[in-house]
């Protein structure tokens, strides 16, 4: 079993740092979108493209593991080093899917109500406020 080179450890560390930065960049937007359901200013194409990019990064990491294990026999140590990167990419893909789902749902509901997305979001927010007021008045 060959020892893992310092270059490979540095490469994986940089990849993990980039994954964590992306994770913390998307987390506030995802939490805000879940809380407010407001996706009017967001484009669905951005989240789909980001999802595909992260999927490609994940596949690249998996293929790297397979190649290194096959050719250089690093075994589980390489897998253990790249696992955090794969987990971060998986969480990032999940965050993208959550926002994309809320966006698609808002666009769909807006079309049902024959509104644009901005009008529907205002309408839905007004409905929530009415419900809160009626609950307080009871």
From Swiss-Prot:
Superkingdom of origin organism: Bacteria
The UniProt record lists the keyword Repeat: no
Keyword Endoplasmic reticulum attributed: no
GO CC, alphabetical: plasma membrane
Keywords: Cell membrane, Membrane, Transmembrane, Transmembrane helix
Predominant location category: membrane
UniProt topology in membrane: Multi-pass membrane protein
Transmembrane segments: 8-28, 47-67, 82-102
Record-annotated disulphide pairs: none
Compartments, record wording: Cell membrane
Family, as annotated: To U.parvum UU007, UU008 and UU041.
Record's protein name: Uncharacterized protein UU042
Originating species: Ureaplasma parvum serovar 3 (strain ATCC 700970)
């Amino acid at each position: 079993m060959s020892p893992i080179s310092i270059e490979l450890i540095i490469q994986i560390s940089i990849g993990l740092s980039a994954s964590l930065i992306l994770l913390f960049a998307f987390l506030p937007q995802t939490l805000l979108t879940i809380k407010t359901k407001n996706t009017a200013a967001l484009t669905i194409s951005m989240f789909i493209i980001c999802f595909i990019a992260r999927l490609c990064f994940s596949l690249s990491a998996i293929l790297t593991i397979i190649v290194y294990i096959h050719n250089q026999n690093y075994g589980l140590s390489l897998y253990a080093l790249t696992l955090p990167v794969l987990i971060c990419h998986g969480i990032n893909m999940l965050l993208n899917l959550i926002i994309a789902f809320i966006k698609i749902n808002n666009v769909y509901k807006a079309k049902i109500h024959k509104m644009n997305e901005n009008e529907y979001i205002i309408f839905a927010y007004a409905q929530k406020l009415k419900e809160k007021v009626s609950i307080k008045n009871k």
